[in-house]
Amino acid sequence: MDNQFQSSKPIYLQIADQIFYRLVRKELLPGDKLPSVREMAIQTKVNPNTIQRTYSEMERLGIVETRRGQGTFIAEKAEIVDELKDKLTREVLEGFVKQMKELGLTKEEMLEGIKTFTEGG
């Protein structure tokens, strides 16, 4: 897992985002077991309390479920991945549009730029 964290967002949320991206890319699937808190802390080089907070937040959001004595698993709800994809897409687009507006681009210029970029131009 990439552990270069930004200072602008709490680390536990950045780790959750990394897991969300893995879910959307289908690197993790509903029912998959996540590493234990200790294992994830070692992988990400953060305090186990940070990982516990990450897992608790994801459980609060319904993304994971903790099974006593077994560990933490991706929730087996089919709609989770679609909801996450929509949420992450919206966040990326909001950031993109905000930055483009700060540069003074119009909606048409943004769309033309996207078209040119995606067509390899």
Curated annotation (Swiss-Prot):
Residues 37-56 bind DNA. Gene3D superfamilies: Winged helix-like DNA-binding domain superfamily/Winged helix DNA-binding domain. Keywords: DNA-binding, Transcription, Transcription regulation. The keyword Transcription regulation applies. GO terms for molecular function: DNA binding; DNA-binding transcription factor activity. Residues 9-77 form the HTH gntR-type domain. The keyword DNA-binding applies. InterPro entries: Tscrpt_reg_HTH_GntR, WH-like_DNA-bd_sf, WH_DNA-bd_sf. It holds the Pfam family GntR. PANTHER family: GNTR-FAMILY TRANSCRIPTIONAL REGULATOR, HTH-TYPE TRANSCRIPTIONAL REPRESSOR YTRA. This is Uncharacterized HTH-type transcriptional regulator YhcF. It comes from Bacillus subtilis (strain 168).
